Amino acid sequence: MAPIKKRNQQNQPNINERIRFPKIRVVDADGTQLGIMAPSEAMEIADERNLDLVLVSDKADPPVCRVMDYGKFKFEQEKKAREAKKKQHTSDVKEVKMRYKIQTHDYEVRVNHAKRFLKSGDKVKATVTFRGREIQHSHLAEALLKKMANDLLDFAEIQQAPKREGRNMIMYLSPKK
């Protein structure tokens, strides 16, 4: 039979009876200082008010504890974490592919796609693909990518200049700050 694992005490916050310090500084829910006292006295104050005693900072001397409703405090922290996660935007790399013999309208469509990606905060990888002997005309592809960078000057800055990788020529653009 496998041994029963105890719940890890480190993951649980120091509240009420779990506070193990000889003296603590106690702060009220509204921020007023109640003074330095033993944890048992602070627990009595918290019990009178039907609140919890929560360890705020164990680095201070003496450690700081606050009398508050722990359930409400935990809910507020989780809510703040959710809001921060919503606002966080991961920057993806979006690719715009074309050939060096691209027509004007098709080129404009690619530029508009790149603009849209850059406005949404994503990086853009502009790729010009070669087929067969087209690779001999890599200077035309480089000129096309430089033209694209010039057209997107208001929205982007070149992160990596046009460079050949195998049968492709690639340029990276990142949104302007």
UniProtKB/Swiss-Prot annotation:
InterPro entries: T_IF-3_C_sf (IPR036788), T_IF-3_N_sf (IPR036787), Translation_initiation_fac3_CS (IPR019813), Translation_initiation_fac_3 (IPR001288), Translation_initiation_fac_3_C (IPR019815), Translation_initiation_fac_3_N (IPR019814). Signal peptide: none annotated. One of its GO terms (molecular function) is ribosome binding. Keywords: Cytoplasm, Initiation factor, Protein biosynthesis. GO terms for biological process: ribosome disassembly. It is found in: Cytoplasm. Its main location: cytoplasm. Disulfide bonds: none annotated. Pfam families: IF3_C (PF00707), IF3_N (PF05198). One of its GO terms (cellular component) is cytosol. Monomer. IF-3 binds to the 30S ribosomal subunit and shifts the equilibrium between 70S ribosomes and their 50S and 30S subunits in favor of the free subunits, thus enhancing the availability of 30S subunits on which protein synthesis initiation begins. Belongs to the IF-3 family. PANTHER family: TRANSLATION INITIATION FACTOR IF-3 (PTHR10938), TRANSLATION INITIATION FACTOR IF-3, MITOCHONDRIAL (PTHR10938:SF0). This is Translation initiation factor IF-3. It comes from Acaryochloris marina (strain MBIC 11017). The lineage of its organism: Bacteria, Bacillati, Cyanobacteriota, Cyanophyceae, Acaryochloridales. The gene is infC.
